[in-house]
Amino acid sequence: MSKDIRVRYAPSPTGLLHIGNARTALFNYLYARHHGGTFLIRIEDTDRKRHVEDGERSQLENLRWLGMDWDESPESHENYRQSERLDLYQKYIDQLLAEGKAYKSYVTEEELAAERERQEVAGETPRYINEYLGMSEEEKAAYIAEREAAGIIPTVRLAVNESGIYKWHDMVKGDIEFEGGNIGGDWIIQKKDGYPTYNFAVAIDDHDMQISHVIRGDDHIANTPKQLMVYEALGWEAPEFGHMTLIINSETGKKLSKRDTNTLQFIEDYRKKGYLPEAVFNFIALLGWNPGGEDEIFSREELIKLFDENRLSKSPAAFDQKKLDWMSNDYIKNADLETIFEMAKPFLEEAGRLTDKAEKLVELYKPQMKSVDEIIPLTDLFFSDFPELTEAEREVMTGETVPTVLEAFKAKLEAMTDDKFVTENIFPQIKAVQKETGIKGKNLFMPIRIAVSGEMHGPELPDTIFLLGREKSIQHIENMLKEISK
């Protein structure tokens, strides 16, 4: 790299951290760390109507939970919030006004709406038409005086070079260009309330903070020519741009929408459900990028080492909840028990299940969990009198030899003394039933498993029976015998 790498994640504090925004932050983070550059966070809080109390803290907290750190932010540097930089924006607005590259616009919302309606009826492309068009200097001065006397507060618009071509080589999509005449006319750079518009403030901030590369979602492609216009007007060199493809729902094939209620889309949701941050980090890193090869499980350090911006995908990234759950399960299985038990404690405590056997239950079901909150439904059988059965389980229990197996195994449990009721002694009792009845394989193990746990699959059967306890195991078998005799 010929210049210092400085990249940024610039969220608006308007709500929770969405998976798409988390990906933007993560790719900027990986790019900076891979190249030994600087990763900074800037808060874009000029949209006061959408500002959410505590939104900034929530964004930073969830980024930290994912495992990201940064070199510069509002926490360590002054004026890293746009609301703290209004004087800087005003400086450049005044400069553009003085140079005739921008002007004050007194057109009202009603006049703009009427013009848009006229254009629509005429079949014209909607655009702002300079209100001073055709006016002499005297007429222009009289118009401004009349508007100011009426108390109309002006906006400031950038004078667009309609014949200009605004192009860049995108890091992801290759060469892109826009004609100046196709962006809707002179556009507002300062609103009536004195706040800058998004595209103006972003360009000023990126230049002032010496941002070398702007990596963001492709919904920002249409913003780029406007930002290039600001760079051109102020005589600045623009950063490089890279626009990541959108994220689609793997089930619908459509753009991931916040209305897709079947998909968890906010990092806060994953935190609350007990996903491991390393798993979510790993999953997001592969949304629109991959290092090549078949492997999909990578540590943060491995992802930093492997990250190559040239492998950013030009095709939409599919958000697959099943893949995330598979990946999360892999991380939970391989995590140490202490970590998962600590994560499980709040769920167990809320459900009244933080007993002396709680840690053993977590150990038993850790290999099955996709998220730690699943410890509650997975352990229902230990805290209920009779497990609910599926149709497939009921069909198994209609087998001719089922009562024989259950009666024989119940007798074995009843004969065991408390000191002999330990995990390693339970399997021999099942084998003894096999020897006595001649029933083996699935016809032996499946009825016992379903009667005791209410499931056809699960942890090792002796472990389940031991943790359930001798009396409760006997009770479950008795309940099942009553059920199948009806």
Curated annotation (Swiss-Prot):
Main location: cytoplasm
Sequence motif: 'HIGH' region, positions: 11-21
EC number(s) from the headed UniProt entry: 6.1.1.17
GO CC term, one of those recorded: cytosol
MF (Gene Ontology): ATP binding; glutamate-tRNA ligase activity; tRNA binding; zinc ion binding
A Gene Ontology biological process term: glutamyl-tRNA aminoacylation
Motif ('KMSKS' region): 255-259
CDD domains given in the database record: GluRS_core
Keywords, ordered alphabetically: Aminoacyl-tRNA synthetase, ATP-binding, Cytoplasm, Ligase, Nucleotide-binding, Protein biosynthesis
Record flagged with keyword Transmembrane helix: no
Signal sequence annotation: none
InterPro entries named among the record's database cross-references: aa-tRNA-synth_I_cd-bd, aa-tRNA-synth_I_codon-bd_sub2, aa-tRNA-synth_I_CS, aa_tRNA-synth_I_cd-bd_sf, Glu-tRNA-ligase_bac/mito, Glu/Gln-tRNA-synth, Glu/Gln-tRNA-synth_Ib_cat-dom, GluQ/Sye
Protein family membership: Belongs to the class-I aminoacyl-tRNA synthetase family. Glutamate--tRNA ligase type 1 subfamily.
Described function: Catalyzes the attachment of glutamate to tRNA(Glu) in a two-step reaction: glutamate is first activated by ATP to form Glu-AMP and then transferred to the acceptor end of tRNA(Glu).
Name of the molecule in the record: Glutamate--tRNA ligase
Gene name per UniProt: gltX
